[in-house]
Regions:
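Short strand-coil-strand connectors
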Residues: 193-199, 217-220, 231, 256-258, ...
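SH3/SH3-like beta-barrel fold
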Residues: 213-217, 253, 272-274, 337
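A conserved acidic, glycine/proline-rich C-terminal tail/linker
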Residues: 226-258
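Catalytic P-loop NTP-binding/switch module of NTPases
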Residues: 259-303
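Structured functional modules or segments
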Residues: 291-342
Length: 342
């Protein structure tokens, strides 16, 4: 940041006037970094996403600025660029600006389509970025930087928070809570799928007078009928309590000796969790298999509608995993749809 108006200077030069300052007179007064928040999936070749922005809120704090055309309720369509906002962090040093920007992104409430927020935070907090090692090859050379920001314990806390929030929202005793088993002799359970095609997590809660026993089980496939045969692992000393909070609920969850206040918001089958340090999104699986979906078949799909511009295979061709099947044009970009298996 130098306090100079470069646009005004360009106009002055175009009019034949001299520059008002020479290089030695320009003094840096701080640093600013801009991050572009996109509805795109870094884990799937940055494929753009569409959908409803259920909630968008940015915390006010010194040094943070947000330029955005979206509000809560906005729809991200396939007809335009998927950029959601430009977020700028300003500080006395480059490290300060990066820290302010990362903190603002983390504390932002963004309930909607898959986006690149976690990747931006990981980059801003990486040693390579803070050291200034930022060429155009950064993402290719620093692939490890884009590893998940949240830990396994964070994911466990969020899954437990979702389970307790769902139970609280379906409180009537004489009703069957959506996605919950209410058999008195059996533990209550709910199955959740993490965002981005992640595996399934089943949270099982045994209710006791002296406290709940919380267990977790992870699978690659939805464990409908076999849920009780899963070797669910108990979370020793885990506890949770629900507190009302505006439109949603706050669940205070303790796992591995670390407690977190998890704000949980639900929109249909989508559930979002924010704890002030990490965010996650989940899909609530129905209690029983939807056979109409099973009959629909399986195969490669895309999260965004578009126009098929090229077909790379023909009926009867043998394909291998990772092979391009079709090219799809959407949001001013071309996307390859790949085979999932051989």
């Amino acid at each position: 940041i130098t306090g100079t108006d470069l646009v005004a200077w360009q106009i002055a030069v175009a009019e034949g006037r001299p520059l008002p300052l020479v290089q030695d007179q320009i003094v840096a007064q701080g640093h600013a970094i801009e991050a572009r928040l996109y509805a795109e999936d870094p884990a799937h070749d940055y494929l753009p996403a569409t959908g409803v922005i259920h909630r968008f809120a940015v915390p006010a704090r010194p040094g943070l600025r947000v330029d955005s055309g979206i509000v809560s309720g906005s729809v991200i369509s396939p007809h335009y660029d998927p950029m959601l906002a430009k977020v700028i962090g300003t500080g006395a040093s480059r490290d300060d600006a990066a820290a302010i920007l990362a903190d603002g992104l983390v504390r932002m409430t963004l309930h909607g389509p898959v986006n690149n927020r976690d990747s931006l935070v990981a980059i801003l907090r990486s040693d390579a970025f803070l050291a200034g090692d930022t060429t155009t090859a950064f993402l290719d050379e620093q692939v490890h930087v884009l590893a998940p920001v949240a830990s396994a314990e964070d994911g466990q806390r969020h899954a437990v928070a979702v389970a307790y929030a769902l139970a609280a929202s379906e409180a009537p005793v004489d009703a069957v809570p959506l996605a919950w088993s209410n058999v008195p002799a059996a533990p209550q359970f709910v199955t959740l799928q993490g965002r981005g095609g992640a595996g399934y997590t089943t949270v099982l809660v045994d209710r006791h007078r002296d406290g709940d026993r919380i267990r977790l089980a992870s699978t690659d496939d939805v464990p409908y009928a076999q849920v009780f045969s899963i070797d669910a692992a108990e979370l020793p000393g885990a506890s949770a309590r629900v507190e009302p909070a505006g439109d949603g609920v706050v669940v205070v969850v303790e796992v591995a000796g670390v407690a977190a206040r998890c704000a949980v918001a639900r929109y249909g089958d989508e559930v979002f969790v924010d704890d002030g340090l990490h965010s996650s999104a989940w899909t609530v699986e129905p209690r029983f298999a939807d056979h109409s979906l099973d009959a629909a078949g399986h195969g490669p799909s895309t999260t965004v509608p578009g126009t098929i511009t090229a077909v790379s295979v023909a009926p009867g061709d043998a394909v291998v995993a990772g092979q391009t099947l079709v090219m799809l044009e959407a949001m001013k970009m071309e996307h390859r749809i790949l085979a999932d298996v051989d």
